[in-house]
């Protein structure tokens, strides 16, 4: 039994359309297998003669699966149950993505009419449905289980944001999900597929827990074969033994989108490239009668090919249709071909599952006049179902745990994540849950687990594979802003991650922002500490260069602009709080330097001094708690967020020139407190979120923290320019309503929404009573697109007094 813990490839599903086009172009550029390979010979085999070419094809395909070379026709498809001499019935299920739900409808009609299935061959989605059914799972049970999950999220490795470690959630605020490059001694690399298929394999492992590992698929309740393609040679590979979940995943690994599955040293991908309707495979298993279900997408009319991606997708569709046509020609007179009318259901349209199931049932019902001749009596069929039921797995007590790692992955990292120990009863679900922290951390290609029994020795094998496109990783993000109240700007984010520098798990992290209004850099080491709870120690250094606008007391008249440069070095101790968030505390040394951009007098009085250049230093102790359970950091529809930060200066010094700012600036120690809370609740396609935020400096004021709090910009008093209001005391509140008008499958755009928000708040300088004066208001009406590259929002914000701001922004960084 094999199970795989999951990790998130957030945003990947929204890139599906582009990747399909890439797959199409790649597949179309490959030459068809030459004569003598599995694909050509299988396609040219005659339906009435076992020619030498056909025999060579069968031998090639079977030997590719490590079966005996002389086992050209295995004859494992035996009529089991019913009257003596009845024909053995094989089921050939084609690939087609979400259209494959039609297979469930076919199976339900066959069950209702007591038509037995003696062997199954499946490709891609047909391999998924066929493999589960072959393991003994009834069609009704399969439909119920599939209806309780989001198969699209599972297939595309989408993990709930709340299940990610806090470091990954923080990265999401700056970097594009799924856009990660690796580099090493051999140069820059990218993953062979954006989706590793871990969640799907884990789900299949859970649902097939009764199936022993590394056994022939002939021993399943129904003999089974999965068809895949060797990525290197283009040959058809018929998988007939080993890990059932891995065989299924290999059969549906669409090149470019899903990473190849490695089996016996071969990189295997979607079998639809060579045999999307595996009639010949079912025949070689010994089926006397083949029920073939073709769910392939029809070719599109010429006027529907509106883009290069459409043309490339049509190209690969033609190639797949050719191998399907070849397989259909191998059907005999007694065979039955079903072609459900699936209309425009796309291969990614998992939301149309019920429609696809109904189409499959309708096609099978229409063919009942030909199918009923194979029906068994009620008594015979009851005996057949009993013999082919999914067995309950016996309890297995773990006698040994064997951890295998690749690359620079320390075994300690894996062992620390496991709570299971020798002598425990094996529970694949629990082990997968233990490994969740590893796979969702983003540093692994896969973490698989299986139990291998040899007599009384039951070994739990864990295989943790480092991402082969590492060990160094680059992350990228982009933010752009344009509005009617300021100049607009951009921010480009580049991150670097290097895990496992040492056997103890030391990680190096670096983040850089280059923007029109902000430049920053941060480097950090994270060293896990021995023991439980995930404690770590983190020395760091950071630099920030930003522009701060200074306004008069009304917040309307711009007086000057300061270039602020700050550096901070420090040492933190960190503690992850389960999957809720993170707590850090430590000590740091901060320096700051400010210089005015404009050589102007401070006021209009005669002899007034000019705005000064200043410098400040401070030694501080800081603690920060973050709890983040939002489903999206910018447009949350459900969840909650809390941040609490306290910083105390142990020593503080300002340069003499800071006296020009008045008596509020001093070398007296200060304490800065900041808090933010947000909650979001979803009601169908509607959602409401509320935010409160506040901050205050107590004691002296160092110019390093004099401009820490800002308001202005989208969702932060949107009627005002970005960071227009600056001070060291803050109060702010926000209520936002959103209506998700539509969602998109397999598109760079995830959702289209409209919304409105009401905001109130202000900032104050030191010594001014918080809440004194007028609280500024802003009312925003916006349209938002949630995209693979970050949120895109446009709208208008209004405020009393005729103030308004029209804006267009991309990214989460403004």
Model segments located where?
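Patatin-like phospholipase
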Residues: 29-49, 60-121, 131-436, 440-447, ...
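Bacterial N-terminal signal peptides
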Residues: 14-27
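Solvent-exposed coil/turn segments that connect beta secondary-structure elements
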Residues: 138, 147, 229-232, 242-244, ...
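C-terminal outer-membrane beta-barrel translocator/porin domains of Gram-negative envelope proteins
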Residues: 440, 446-448, 459-461, 473-483, ...
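Acidic/histidine-enriched alpha-helical segments
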Residues: 300-302, 372-389, 589-590, 639-642, ...
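Gly/Ala-rich beta-loop-alpha elbow adjacent to hydrolase catalytic centers
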Residues: 122, 126
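N-terminal secretory signal peptides that target proteins for export/translocation
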Residues: 1-11
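Gram-negative/organellar outer-membrane beta-barrel architecture
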Residues: 428-434, 443-624, 710-711, 715, ...
């Amino acid at each position: 039994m094999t199970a795989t813990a999951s990790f998130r490839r957030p945003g990947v599903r929204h890139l599906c359309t582009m990747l399909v086009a890439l797959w199409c172009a790649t597949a179309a550029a490959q030459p068809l297998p030459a004569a003598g390979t599995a694909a050509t010979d299988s396609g040219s085999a005659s339906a009435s003669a076992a020619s030498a070419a056909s025999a060579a094809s069968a031998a090639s395909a079977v030997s590719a699966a490590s079966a005996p070379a002389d086992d050209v026709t295995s004859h494992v498809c035996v009529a089991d149950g019913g009257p003596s001499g009845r024909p053995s019935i094989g089921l050939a299920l084609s690939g087609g993505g979400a259209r494959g739900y039609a297979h469930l409808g076919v199976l339900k009609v066959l069950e209702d009419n007591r038509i037995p299935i003696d062997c199954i061959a499946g490709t891609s989605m047909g391999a998924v449905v066929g493999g589960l059914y072959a393991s003994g799972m009834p069609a009704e049970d399969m439909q119920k289980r599939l209806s309780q999950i989001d198969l699209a999220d599972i297939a595309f490795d989408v993990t709930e944001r709340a299940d990610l470690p806090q470091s990954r959630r923080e990265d999401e605020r700056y970097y594009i999900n799924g856009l990660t490059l690796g580099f090493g001694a051999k140069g820059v690399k990218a993953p062979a597929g954006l989706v590793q298929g871990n969640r799907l394999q884990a789900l299949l492992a859970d649902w097939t827990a009764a199936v022993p590992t590394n056994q022939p698929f002939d021993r399943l309740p129904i003999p089974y074969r999965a068809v895949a393609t060797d990525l290197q040679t283009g040959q058809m590979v018929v998988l007939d033994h080993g890990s059932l979940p891995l065989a299924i995943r290999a059969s549906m690994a669409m090149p470019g989108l899903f990473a190849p599955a490695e089996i016996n040293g071969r990189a295997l991908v979607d079998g639809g490239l060579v045999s999307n309707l595996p009639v010949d495979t079912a025949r070689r298993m010994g089926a006397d009668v083949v029920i073939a279900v073709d769910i392939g997408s029809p070719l599109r009319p010429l006027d529907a090919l509106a883009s290069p991606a459409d043309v490339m997708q049509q190209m690969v569709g033609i190639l797949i249709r050719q191998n399907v046509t070849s397989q259909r020609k191998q059907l005999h007179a007694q065979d039955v071909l079903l072609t459900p009318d699936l209309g425009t259901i796309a291969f990614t349209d998992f939301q149309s599952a019920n429609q696809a199931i109904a189409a499959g049932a309708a096609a099978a019902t229409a063919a009942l006049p030909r199918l009923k001749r194979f029906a068994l009596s009620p008594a015979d069929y009851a005996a057949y179902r009993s013999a082919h039921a999914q067995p309950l797995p016996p309890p297995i007590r773990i006698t040994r745990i064997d951890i295998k790692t690749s690359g620079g992955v320390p075994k300690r990292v894996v062992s620390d994540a496991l709570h299971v120990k020798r002598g425990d009863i094996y529970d694949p679900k629990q082990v997968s849950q233990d490994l969740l922290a590893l796979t969702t951390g983003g540093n692994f290609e896969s973490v698989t687990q299986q139990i291998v029994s040899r007599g009384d020795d039951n070994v739990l094998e864990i295989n943790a594979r480092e991402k082969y496109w590492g060990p160094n990783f680059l992350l990228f993000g982009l933010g752009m802003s344009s509005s009617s109240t300021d100049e607009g700007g951009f921010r480009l984010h580049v991150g670097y991650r290097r895990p496992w520098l040492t056997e103890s798990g030391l990680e190096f992290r670096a983040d850089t922002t280059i923007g029109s209004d902000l430049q920053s850099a941060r480097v950090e080491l994270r060293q896990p500490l021995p023991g439980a709870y995930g404690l770590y120690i983190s020395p760091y250094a950071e630099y920030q260069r930003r522009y701060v606008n200074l306004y008069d007391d009304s917040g309307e008249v711009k007086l000057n602009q300061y270039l602020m440069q700050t550096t901070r070095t420090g040492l933190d101790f960190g503690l992850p709080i389960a999957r809720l968030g993170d707590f850090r505390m430590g000590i740091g040394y901060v320096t700051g330097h400010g210089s005015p951009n404009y050589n102007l007098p401070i006021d209009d009085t005669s002899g007034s001094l000019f705005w000064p250049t200043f410098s400040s230093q401070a030694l501080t102790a800081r603690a920060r708690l973050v709890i983040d359970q939002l489903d999206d950091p910018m447009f949350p529809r459900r969840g909650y967020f809390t941040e609490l930060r306290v910083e105390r200066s142990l020593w503080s010094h300002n340069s003499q020139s800071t006296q020009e700012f008045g008596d509020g600036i001093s070398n007296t120690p200060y304490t800065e407190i900041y808090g933010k809370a947000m909650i979001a609740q979803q009601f169908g396609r509607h959602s409401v979120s509320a935010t409160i935020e506040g901050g205050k400096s107590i004691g002296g004021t160092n110019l390093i923290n004099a401009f820490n709090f800002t308001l202005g910009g989208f969702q932060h008093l949107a009627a005002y320019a970005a960071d227009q209001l600056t001070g060291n005391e803050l109060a702010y509140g926000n209520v936002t309503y959103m209506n998700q008008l539509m969602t998109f499958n397999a598109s760079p755009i995830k959702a289209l929404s409209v919304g409105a928000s009401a905001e109130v708040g202000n900032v104050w300088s030191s010594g001014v009573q918080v809440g004194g004066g007028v609280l500024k208001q802003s009312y925003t009406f916006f349209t938002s697109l949630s995209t693979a590259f970050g949120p895109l929002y446009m709208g208008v914000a209004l405020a009393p007094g005729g103030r308004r701001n029209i804006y267009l922004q991309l990214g989460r960084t403004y």
